[in-house]
């Protein structure tokens, strides 16, 4: 989880349970505990809720599956989604509610705590789902400098390890049986009691305050409560100086001034707005039947306009038939089948045509697609033929010439066909699914979130989401396929179940009893037929028992389900089971969306959504769309005749009153509210300023003088200091909107902005029921006597003097109309709903506007005071609201250049000079009962449409690269792709510089090649070990392989030994793991060996140990016979030409100096680089060496099978001149070849398209090998399934290629003289600071203990070995004093060693990477804080010391360091350290990398 969920630990004592539990609850009200069993360790599906469920508030509807596997507030949405856990601010008595909420969720009773205690309690911090990693860091930023900095640092540093938490929890009272917690010393207990005494005091001592001060404090705190900031009831232990807490931001505040500063912060404002928005969405009631009908009509229009119909399906079938005729000659045994939306009808008319080729088993997928590509290119029926063979599903893309539809042809895509077959059957049996999915997909298309290549979701995912929703409804419309009715079913065994096919409207499932299988992940492998059990489940319910739910209602419920109810961050969308599946059970990372394909259950099909901004954008669109469809929206009827609705706009000195002729029904004004629109004198107005007005009672009065007046309940104060004043009175009758059009004022350089606040208050007096059917569902009447104060403040109306700004104004008009319409729509809801949602109506998510508001003064006066409320309440206008359809009349393509029609609207003057000021402080609405015939009863008045701006509010998805995770570009344009690096041309190679390169290459061979004596010593070690092992393993034979025998070995390189047993040609019938463990036990008896370590989890089990006398590290593997033949092959190549050895040694020196030559640490092995050198020499023109595996004397290539692979190669090197015609033709010097190698791999060779393979001369494509997902592909010459570059990450690949590119520059640009800081040629050419640009090799995949990849620190074999040794030392048979003395002595040695190392590092100005990480925490100023910090710091010091002791060197056998840091290793003769790194600057830089 990283920074998004830092654990919080609770201190415990022996006498009482949780210390400061109240304090813990107040300081972290969003935390919850997950109770797990010991077996699960957080990844089992048997997770239980540790807290009681919260009841859903009465205002909510629909089921809430978020309460599935987690506690009420354990998900990231709980704090922002009151539907899930209703917070305190939802009720008026929020003090008591908050207290009850905390006590229910976190305290509970003793029985409830004891009921759920199968394992450790893991705290989960409830986070907003919109929070990213950066926002989580910002959540504590305000505390810096407030007296809590040191505590917060300690909190982040010391309490972030889950393992340490488990160890602490092991000592809790509920786990006393497992481990007894030692009693605290008396001094510590005394200090704790003193601390508790200090913290138990009042947060603010009111007894010392005067009456005036106390009154001021109460008033200030009442003001803070409105912003969700309350006084603490007790000082928190982690920040004793805090006095207040912000519930929204989960922040501690020291004083009232700091609280006011916190209120002004953008983070608090954002959280407040989000809270208001969530309140609005949560409290919206279900849509009325008339609304449902209107929503259904909107969906029907989408289906009719964009959906697939019978003629479209026939057209796609015809394309398939044409393609079959094209393939008939080249692929006679293959058949085609449609899949995707072309078959299921869950798509659009212009959707791609997906065609899959079924081919016989004798053919391979690459062969089939290459033939498909060839056929389509030669066909006249298809154009624009292209191939995308590097996609996850390789396809050939073309376009049908007649219809213009895009066709994608795949081969053997069985899972996609099964999923399509499933969805097709569901669409035929459940008719409501097709329009629901088409609407969902069209919504996604409008919002631009159905583009997986841009970080969105695959289109068919929305069909799975719709099916999942229909299964999870309170009254489900579709069944699930696996459940308790199956005898063997349980969530723990879900991985053993798989869906196989759809037959006769039923799903065929299969169960495999795999007791040894991993239940945490689903199994896709085909099980054995003998252990398989099959069954069938119907696809749909019985028609008689299905509820009749219209599509419009399902659409609104689907939006609510995913916007508010379902926990997308923690749960998996799976249509197989009814139970909710956690991500831990599938071992999928949290965050964003997880969707399981029912026929490919290992894969998260939503993993293309790989960035947080797009995820937040999807949630924004879901919430916005739900709010749009949940609120009533009316359609404007221009043909209806209504009494005139005069709108009088007065400007001084220009005043016009339009009284002649009928007024239009609706007037377009963007916003009406408390705003002042200023204009410079003499500036011509341009554009128009539109807003929707709520319908008022039909009263027509003239506006008086510019002085302060009270007219018809609209309070309009005039500003005398302004040059002009516009006062407006709006009145209309019935249910239609009054419309007024005001000329905008402004200039090219000035923008008029308006800010909206929308408190909608209701006095709950005199309410009675309405008989109108639509409004009964809302729980209140629009036509009842009620005092509803609706304050409308004009928002963001920009003056436009040029056409460039017109598009922006158009969007603001539409958005403003939408927000005002939603505000007025709430007038038909109950007063309680209005009061809870009033403050959230005009929610603005644009952060840019907030930044502008902070940077500049508002240009519009907003006069909101407490005194004005009473004045406004005295003058109310009787009114009612019947909805507005203005928004539907507008669209994204509205032409803003259309002139304003003054004769049709209330015009407020043209060419106004001076300052135009609109100051409408309040519009009060007073509802009265009206005749029933006047109420909106016609269903046709509700109108909805699918529009992008309505769903997105002007936002767009963030473009994030899936490769580097940075914003602003896509993967195909990623600058980190090494193929996109622009290489500078190299100057011509001079003869003098070429001679220098020759000398460098030859010197590398002379310096590092082993001598004859060393080769003899290695053979002697082999013989000695073989004779020793034979005593326990008779018939054992040891053989040297690898660098010791292939001709490319270094001095002091590892000794690789292969062990075989007479009578066994292969390892079949042998228990390799047990044999390796027994071999390790035997080798421990050898007095000349140290650090024997069996590694049985590797691909080839080995025993590692250290040979004392020679100082060599030895690896013994069992039946690694292919490696023996690889050694023979490389040895044969090294004997062909001496330049082969020179280049291979130069390559090995280059890779070791750049730290890219160790496969165990995530890079390539030296064997892989040797193959790269051989491949280059084979591809050179003319070639330096032949392809030995392609040279043979007979007509057919011989076969010599070992482990199922042909290991034949031409090994008669003496006869090579007669068998290979190219022998001796290449006479290039070795230096020129070395530079040519660097240029070949940086300029010519295409790593994406081709494979490095020394077994064939012709090029081999990555698609042919089906290794398209890897970065560097190197094929083993014998084991053709082994890719030596499979372990490379993107970071390491870029690091390797950067080294090659820099090497090309260093070795390719001639120099006249060498710099003084590089005294030798080798130090100049192999300077790691130049080759790697001073960067260290990526180690993010390496273990922190041993530095190897393939495991993490907790699974490190060296760590387990240390633990076993300590357990043996602490056995009762040994004396405690001796073991204690021994351990303390070792600890002192380690401490002295690291002290000396740090001193030497400071002298050399280096920073060692492996130094101990324990750093003393900076002590706080006051004494109480020192007491708080003392104990945890010492504990973590001991922890870090223990981690350093768990490191053990393979060479010297001592603890505290690894082989790379060993002085013996660095000082060994012939090593890189002694040769190059002690020469000038290279020594310093290299030491920095190695330490």
From Swiss-Prot:
Task: Specify where it is mainly localized.
Answer: cytoplasm
Query: Which residues fall in a compositionally biased region of kind Basic and acidic residues?
Result: 1377-1399
Spell out the residue ranges making up region: Sufficient for monouridylation activity.
947-1491
Q: What broad class of enzyme is this?
A: transferase
Localization per Swiss-Prot or TrEMBL: Cytoplasm
Q: List keywords of the entry alphabetically.
A: Cytoplasm, Magnesium, Manganese, Metal-binding, Nucleotidyltransferase, Phosphoprotein, Repeat, Transferase, Zinc, Zinc-finger
Zinc fingers typed CCHC-type, residue spans: 959-976, 1341-1358, 1447-1464
List residues modified as Phosphoserine: 132, 172, 600, 747, 891
Which InterPro entries does the entry link to?
Answer: MTPAP-like_central, NT_sf, PAP_assoc, TUT4/7_NTP_transf, Znf_CCHC, Znf_CCHC_sf
Q: Where are the zinc fingers (Matrin-type)?
A: 244-274
Which residues hold Mg(2+)? 1054, 1056
GO cellular component term, pick one: cytoplasm
Kindly list the biological process annotations in GO that this record carries.
miRNA metabolic process; oocyte maturation; polyuridylation-dependent mRNA catabolic process; pre-miRNA processing; RNA 3'-end processing; transposable element silencing by mRNA destabilization
Q: EC number(s) per UniProt?
A: 2.7.7.52
Domain PAP-associated residues, every copy: 551-600, 1230-1282
What the record says about disrupting the gene is:
Double conditional knockouts that have deleted both TUT4 and TUT7 at the secondary oocyte stage are infertile. Females ovulate normal numbers of oocytes with normal morphology of antral follicles but with a slight decrease in the frequency of surrounded nucleolus state oocytes. Mutant oocytes are unable to support early embryonic development, they fail to complete meiosis I properly.
Q: Which residues carry this modification: Phosphothreonine?
A: 64, 865
Positions that bind UTP: 1043-1046, 1053-1056, 1126, 1148, 1166-1170, 1282
Catalysis: reaction(s): RNA(n) + UTP = RNA(n)-3'-uridine ribonucleotide + diphosphate
Output compositional bias ranges, type Acidic residues.
844-857, 885-897
Requisite cofactors? Mg(2+); Mn(2+)
Give any GO molecular function from the UniProt entry.
Answer: RNA uridylyltransferase activity
Tell what the record comments on domains: Utilizes two multidomain functional modules during the switch from monouridylation to oligouridylation. The catalytic module (containing the 3 CCHC-type Zinc finger domains) is essential for both activities while the Lin28-interacting module (LIM) at the N-terminal part is indispensable for oligouridylation.
Q: Which family does it belong to?
A: Belongs to the DNA polymerase type-B-like family.
Q: What is this protein called?
A: Terminal uridylyltransferase 7
- Phylogenetic placement of the source organism: Eukaryota, Metazoa, Chordata, Craniata, Vertebrata
């Amino acid at each position: 989880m990283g920074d998004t969920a830092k654990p919080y630990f609770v201190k415990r004592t022996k006498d009482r349970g949780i210390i400061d539990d109240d304090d813990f609850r107040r300081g972290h009200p969003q935390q919850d505990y997950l109770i797990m069993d010991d077996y699960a360790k957080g990844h089992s599906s048997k997770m239980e809720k540790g807290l009681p469920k919260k009841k859903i508030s009465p205002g909510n509807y629909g089921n809430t599956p978020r309460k599935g596997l987690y506690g009420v507030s354990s998900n990231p949405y709980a704090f922002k989604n009151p539907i899930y856990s209703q917070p305190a601010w939802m009720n008026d008595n929020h003090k008591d509610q908050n207290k009850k909420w905390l006590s229910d969720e976190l305290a509970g009773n003793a029985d409830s705590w004891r009921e759920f205690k199968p394992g450790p309690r893991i705290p989960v911090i409830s986070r907003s789902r919109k929070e990213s990693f950066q926002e989580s860091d910002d959540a504590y930023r305000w505390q810096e400098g407030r007296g809590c900095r040191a505590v917060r640092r300690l909190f982040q540093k010391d309490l972030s390890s889950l393992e340490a938490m488990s160890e602490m929890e092991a000592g809790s009272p509920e786990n006393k049986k497992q481990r007894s917690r030692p009693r605290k010393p008396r001094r510590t207990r005394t200090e704790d009691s003193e601390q508790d005494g200090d913290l138990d005091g009042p947060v603010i001592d009111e007894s010392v305050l005067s009456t005036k001060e106390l009154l001021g404090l109460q008033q200030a705190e009442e003001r803070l409560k409105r912003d969700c900031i309350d006084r603490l009831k007790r000082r928190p232990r982690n920040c004793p100086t805090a006095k207040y807490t912000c519930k929204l931001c989960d922040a501690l505040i020291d004083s009232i001034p700091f609280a006011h500063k916190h209120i002004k912060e953008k983070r608090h404002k954002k959280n407040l707005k989000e809270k208001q928005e969530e309140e609005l969405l949560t409290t919206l009631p279900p849509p009325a039947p008339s609304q449902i009908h209107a929503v259904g009509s909107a969906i029907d229009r989408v289906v009719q306009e964009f959906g697939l119909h019978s003629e479209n399906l026939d057209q796609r079938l015809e394309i398939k038939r044409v393609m079959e005729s094209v393939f008939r000659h080249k692929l006679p045994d293959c058949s085609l089948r449609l899949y995707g939306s072309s078959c299921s009808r869950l798509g659009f008319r212009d959707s791609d045509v997906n065609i899959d080729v079924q081919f016989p088993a004798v053919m391979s997928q690459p062969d089939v697609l290459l033939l498909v590509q060839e056929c389509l290119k030669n066909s006249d029926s298809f154009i624009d033929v292209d191939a995308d063979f590097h996609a996850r599903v390789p396809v050939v893309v073309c376009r049908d010439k007649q219809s213009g539809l895009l066709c994608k042809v795949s081969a053997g895509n069985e899972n996609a066909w099964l999923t399509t077959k499933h969805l097709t059957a569901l669409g035929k049996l459940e008719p409501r699914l097709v329009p629901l999915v088409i609407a969902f997909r069209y919504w996604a298309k409008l919002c631009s979130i159905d583009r997986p290549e841009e970080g969105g979701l695959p289109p068919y995912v929305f069909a799975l989401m719709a099916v999942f929703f229909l299964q999870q409804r309170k009254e489900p419309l579709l069944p699930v396929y696996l459940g308790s009715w199956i005898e063997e079913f349980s969530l723990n065994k879900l991985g053993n179940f798989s869906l196989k096919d759809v037959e006769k409207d039923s799903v065929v499932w299969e169960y495999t009893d795999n007791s040894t299988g991993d239940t945490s992940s689903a199994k896709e492998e085909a099980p054995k037929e003998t252990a398989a059990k099959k069954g069938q489940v119907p696809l749909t319910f019985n028609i008689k028992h299905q509820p009749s739910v219209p599509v419009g209602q399902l659409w609104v419920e689907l939006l609510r389900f995913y916007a508010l109810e379902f926990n997308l961050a923690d749960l998996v969308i799976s249509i197989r089971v009814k139970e909710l599946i956690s991500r831990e059970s599938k071992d999928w990372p949290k965050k964003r969306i997880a969707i399981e394909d029912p026929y490919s259950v290992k894969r998260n099909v939503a993993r293309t959504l790989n960035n947080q901004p797009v995820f937040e954008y999807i949630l924004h669109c879901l919430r916005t769309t739900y709010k749009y469809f949940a609120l009533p929206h009316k359609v404007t009827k221009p043909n209806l005749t209504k009494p005139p609705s005069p709108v009088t706009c007065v400007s001084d000195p220009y005043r016009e009153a339009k009284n002649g002729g009928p007024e239009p029904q609706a007037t377009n004004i963007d916003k009406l509210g408390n705003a002042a629109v200023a204009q410079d004198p003499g500036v011509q107005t341009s554009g128009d300023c539109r807003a929707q007005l709520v319908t008022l009672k039909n009263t027509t009065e003239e506006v008086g003088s510019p002085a302060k007046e009270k007219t018809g309940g609209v309070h309009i104060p005039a500003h005398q200091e302004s040059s002009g004043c516009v006062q407006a009175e709006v009145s209309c009758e019935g249910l239609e909107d009054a419309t007024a059009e005001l000329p905008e004022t402004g200039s090219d350089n000035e923008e008029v902005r308006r800010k909206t606040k929308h408190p909608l208050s209701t006095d709950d007096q005199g309410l009675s029921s309405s008989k109108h059917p639509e409004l009964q569902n809302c729980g209140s009447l629009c036509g009842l006597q009620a005092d509803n104060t609706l304050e409308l403040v004009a928002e963001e109306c920009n003056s436009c003097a040029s056409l460039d700004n017109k598009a922006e104004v158009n969007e603001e008009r539409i958005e403003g109309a939408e927000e005002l319409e939603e505000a007025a729509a709430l007038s038909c809801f109950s007063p309680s709903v209005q009061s809870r949602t009033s403050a959230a109506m005009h929610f603005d998510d644009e952060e840019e506007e907030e930044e502008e508001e902070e940077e500049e003064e508002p240009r519009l006066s907003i006069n909101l005071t407490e005194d004005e409320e009473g004045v406004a309440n005295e003058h109310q206008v009787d009114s009612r609201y019947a909805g507005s359809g203005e928004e539907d009349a507008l669209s994204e393509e509205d032409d803003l250049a259309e002139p304003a029609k003054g004769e049709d609207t209330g015009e407020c003057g043209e060419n106004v000079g001076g300052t135009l000021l609109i100051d409408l402080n309040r519009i009060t609405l007073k509802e009265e009962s009206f005749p029933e015939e006047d109420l909106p009863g016609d269903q046709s008045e509700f109108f909805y449409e699918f529009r992008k701006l309505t769903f997105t509010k002007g936002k767009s998805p963030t473009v994030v690269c899936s490769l580097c995770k940075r914003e602003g570009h896509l993967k195909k344009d990623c600058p980190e792709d090494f193929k996109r690096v622009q290489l500078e041309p190299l100057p011509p190679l001079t003869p003098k510089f070429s001679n220098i390169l020759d000398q460098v290459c030859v010197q590398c061979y002379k310096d590092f090649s082993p001598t004859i004596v060393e080769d003899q010593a290695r053979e002697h070690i082999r013989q000695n070990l073989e004779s020793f092992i034979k005593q326990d393993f008779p018939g054992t034979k040891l053989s040297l392989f690898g660098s010791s025998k292939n001709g490319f070995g270094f001095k002091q390189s590892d000794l690789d030994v292969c062990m075989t047993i007479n009578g066994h040609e292969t390892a079949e019938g042998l228990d390799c793991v047990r044999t390796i463990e027994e071999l390790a036990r035997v080798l421990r008896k050898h007095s000349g060996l140290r650090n024997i370590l069996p590694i049985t989890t590797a691909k080839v089990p080995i025993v590692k140990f250290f040979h004392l006398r020679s100082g060599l590290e030895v690896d013994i593997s069992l039946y690694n016979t292919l490696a023996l033949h690889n050694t023979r092959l490389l040895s044969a190549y090294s004997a062909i030409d001496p330049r082969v050895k020179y280049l291979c040694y130069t390559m090995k020196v280059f890779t070791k100096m750049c730290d890219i030559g160790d496969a165990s640490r995530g890079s390539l092995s030296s064997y892989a680089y040797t193959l790269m050198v051989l491949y280059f020499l084979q591809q050179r023109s003319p070639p330096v060496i032949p392809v030995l595996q392609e040279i043979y004397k007979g007509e057919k290539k011989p076969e010599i099978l070992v482990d199922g692979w042909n290991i034949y190669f031409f090994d008669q090197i003496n006869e090579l001149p007669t068998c290979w015609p190219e022998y001796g033709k290449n006479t290039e010097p070795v230096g020129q070849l070395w530079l040519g190698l660097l240029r070949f791999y940086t300029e010519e060779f295409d790593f994406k398209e081709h494979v490095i393979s020394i077994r064939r001369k012709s090029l081999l494509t990555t698609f042919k090998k089906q290794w398209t997902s890897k970065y560097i592909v190197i094929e083993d010459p014998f084991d053709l399934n082994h890719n030596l570059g499979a372990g490379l990450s993107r970071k390491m690949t870029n690091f390797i290629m950067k080294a090659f590119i820099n090497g090309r520059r260093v070795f390719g640009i001639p120099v006249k003289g060498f710099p003084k800081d590089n005294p030798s040629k080798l130090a100049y050419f192999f300077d790691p600071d130049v080759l790697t640009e001073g960067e260290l090799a990526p180690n993010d995949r390496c273990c922190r203990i041993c530095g190897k990849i393939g495991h993490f620190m907790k699974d490190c074999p060296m760590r387990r070995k240390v633990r076993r040794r300590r357990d043996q030392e602490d056995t009762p048979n040994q004396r405690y004093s001796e073991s204690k003395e021994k351990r303390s002595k070792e600890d002192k040695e380690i401490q002295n060693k690291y002290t000396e190392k740090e001193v030497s590092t400071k002298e050399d100005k280096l920073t060692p990477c492996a130094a101990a990480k324990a750093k003393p925490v900076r002590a706080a100023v006051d004494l109480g804080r020192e007491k708080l910090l003392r104990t945890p710091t010492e504990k973590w010091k001991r922890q870090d010391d223990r981690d350093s002791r768990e490191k053990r060197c393979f060479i010297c056998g001592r603890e505290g360091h690894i082989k790379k840091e060993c002085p013996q290793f660095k000082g060994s003769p012939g090593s890189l350290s002694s040769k190059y790194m002690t020469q000038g600057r290279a020594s310093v830089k290299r030491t920095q990398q190695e330490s």
